[in-house]
């Protein structure tokens, strides 16, 4: 990744991921930080719970195969947050969907 991701893009990505979870199983997302690359990782989304302040995506993380993890979209900040894990200090991440089908 060689460019920053803006809040408006992350809001569109949140909507795209909600739609993806309704239409097909398990979208795969790339999580990263730029310009200081403190995380470069992918997870598989399989569920979602919405509330007024946030959207919590349930995900499979290959680094933590024993239980689901949460990827949180904070509506007010228009940003994704990945909680702390043994490989990550926790905090904001940029998110993009990496595979949507045979033509993408």
Positions of PLM-derived features:
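Cys-His-centered catalytic/binding microenvironment captured across papain-like cysteine peptidases
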Residues: 36-40, 49-104
């Amino acid at each position: 990744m060689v460019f920053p991701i803006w809040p408006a893009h992350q809001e569109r990505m949140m909507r795209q991921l909600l739609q993806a979870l309704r239409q097909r199983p398990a979208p795969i997302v790339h999580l990263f930080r730029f310009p200081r690359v403190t995380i470069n990782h992918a997870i598989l989304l399989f569920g979602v719970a919405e509330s007024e302040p946030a959207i919590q995506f349930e995900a499979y993380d290959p680094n933590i195969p024993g239980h689901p993890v949460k990827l949180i979209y904070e509506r007010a900040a228009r940003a994704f947050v990945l909680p702390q894990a043994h490989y990550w200090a926790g905090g904001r991440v940029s998110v993009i969907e990496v595979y949507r089908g045979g033509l993408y």
